[in-house]
Amino acid sequence: LYMYTRGIGSCFIGNPIIKKKYQYRDKKRMMVVMAFGKPKGSCYRKQAEAKRLSLDDLCVYKETPRQWMKQLLDAARMAPSSMNSQPWRFVVFDSRIHIFSKKHPSDKLGKWDEVNFGIMFANMMTAAEEMWLDVDLIRLDELSQKNFQNNQYVLSAILRP
């Protein structure tokens, strides 16, 4: 997000494109690389061009969310994900966001969830900082013990405006 504010374009590149000789270093496997630089044209694109799901498709609201909550969710929504899978789902109640991962029919997409969620959380936390919101990311035992049919609980964001 910082590079974006400086007019620098970026793109995450997954493992299949990276040459095999560069995939491992010190017994660690490289998962993703970020390419970045000054674009020929604009590095900005319209939200519709990003082909992201709407907040209504991603969120369940227990009550009408405040404007700052929608802004925070929108930052999470716009995060890039592998193959544009957008695995995150949100249950919003008061000043809490319960974050879930959509279960994948294929393990090929699911293996990227840690990277995808890391990027999404970075977007969310950067937006929260810009809005002067305090956010605690916590794992609630009562939700982590439940079995959900189409989703898996990840974390909860507790916000203090």
Place the predicted regions along the sequence by residue.
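Acidic, surface-exposed loops and disordered segments
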Residues: 1-161
